[in-house]
Amino acid sequence: MIKVFKLKEIFMDIDFSKIEKIYGKSVIESISILRDDVIKNIEYFIALGFDDAIDIFERQVLIFICPNEEFISKVNTLIKKIGVNYVDEIENDISLLDELL
């Protein structure tokens, strides 16, 4: 329960107005519809060791809006491709996440 509570706090720190301005209202609606999956996807990203998961979420929001199983599969495939230093590689070049779209 503590982990979920912390995640909800993090979710509240997300700048949804910025996301809406960049991606449009339909993306906000999609996040709302798939809220539980989006939260699980952010949680998985944090568990992988990404310290700036919220910033990555705000910049690459579209990759997080999918069923959790699909997200995990895509992320794991990308990690296998990048290798052991995947956190550093992705944090230094966020465009690597474009493969998840």
Task: State where each predicted segment sits.
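Long amphipathic alpha-helical repeat/alpha-solenoid cores
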Residues: 1-101
